[in-house]
Design a protein with these regions (language model features):
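Non-heme Fe(II)-dependent double-stranded beta-helix
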Residues: 1-12, 19-115, 121-124, 233
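Conserved hydrophobic/aromatic beta-strand scaffold that supports enzyme active sites
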Residues: 15-17, 114, 134-138, 179-181, ...
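Non-heme Fe(II)/2-oxoglutarate
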Residues: 31-32, 37-40, 45-48, 52, ...
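Residues that flank catalytic or metal-binding motifs in active/ligand-binding sites
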Residues: 70, 99, 131-133, 145-147, ...
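Short, structured patches in soluble enzyme cores that scaffold and shape functional sites
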Residues: 102, 117-119, 137-141, 153
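Short, P/G- and charge-enriched loop/turn segments at secondary-structure junctions
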Residues: 120-125, 177-179
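Short, conserved beta-strand element in jelly-roll/cupin
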Residues: 125-144, 191, 215-219
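Double-stranded beta-helix
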Residues: 142-199, 221, 238
Length: 259
């Protein structure tokens, strides 16, 4: 499925973009299904939701996790043909398993994410690396103007960088990196190594930058199951409850910020 050029890009830079992975009709369905999910009520025991307060004092959804088990059409469209998993298996050189999924909505006037690595095992105080590849499914076009991602190429090979308790890479270290913007179109997928440093700015445009992330482990490594991970997640980073204080919303994680 993948070309040698794509495999080399993954090894060298820590990411690879697969253009037009979803046909236009499938992409439209995915976009509509994601909009369905954005309208769900808060759940105490199923999906996990976080919100943010805009500059004009509105509450907008920021992020949701653990939703695919509760939206059959979206799950089937993304996973049933195994194309995404096959691409991940190819890049990792072995079988993989899906740990989690999340949606970051990045609507206009939403916040950004400071430089970080997707180092899941460290905040959860687990001994072994538990994530090895993250697949970003482009729901909308993405570029720097609407809060698109920036990556530091090749730094996925250098292990874990110094970071604070929230997972933000030490600013003095991050300032030494060269950062490249990553642009994609709706329907593309973008697969990156979880050790690849990246960040995104607040969305100051009038365009959404919705992205659905599928997080994969190597099957040969240990780590929690999906159910075990969701228990860990609720304990470490509690989602919003059914009664929310607009001025005291629960943060989606330690790397999120608003200007």
């Amino acid at each position: 499925m993948l070309t040698d050029t794509q495999r080399d890009k993954w090894q060298k830079d820590g990411y690879v973009r697969l253009e037009s992975f979803f046909a236009p009709a499938a992409q439209e369905d995915i976009s509509n299904f994601v909009e369905d999910v954005s309208c769900w009520d808060v759940s105490d025991d199923k999906w996990l939701m976080w919100f943010e307060k805009t500059t004009d004092n509105r509450k907008i959804i920021s992020k949701i996790e653990n939703f695919l088990d509760f939206h059959d059409p979206l799950r089937r469209l993304l996973l049933e043909d195994q194309r995404i998993k096959s691409a991940v298996d190819d890049l990792l050189g072995e079988d993989s398993r899906r740990l989690k999924e999340l949606l970051i909505f990045h609507y206009p006037d939403s916040g950004g994410y400071l430089p970080h690595q997707d180092i899941y095992h460290i905040p959860h105080k687990l001994p072994d690396r538990m994530v090895h590849a993250v697949v970003a499914v482009g729901i909308d076009d993405s570029d720097p103007e609407n809060g698109g991602l920036f990556f530091s190429l090749g730094n996925h090979k250098k292990g874990v960088f110094p970071m604070d308790a929230g997972g933000v890479i030490d600013p003095q270290v991050a300032e030494t990196f060269s950062w490249e913007p990553v642009v994609w179109k709706a329907g593309d997928i973008f697969i990156f190594d979880d050790y690849a440093p990246h960040y995104s700015r607040p969305n100051k445009s009038n365009r959404s930058r919705r992205t659905l992330y599928l997080v994969f482990q190597r099957a040969s490594t240990g780590g929690p199951t999906r159910a075990e991970y969701n228990v860990l997640k609720r304990a470490l980073n509690p989602p919003e409850g059914k009664v929310a204080d607009l001025d005291n919303l629960k943060p989606p994680n330690g790397i999120f910020y608003r200007d």
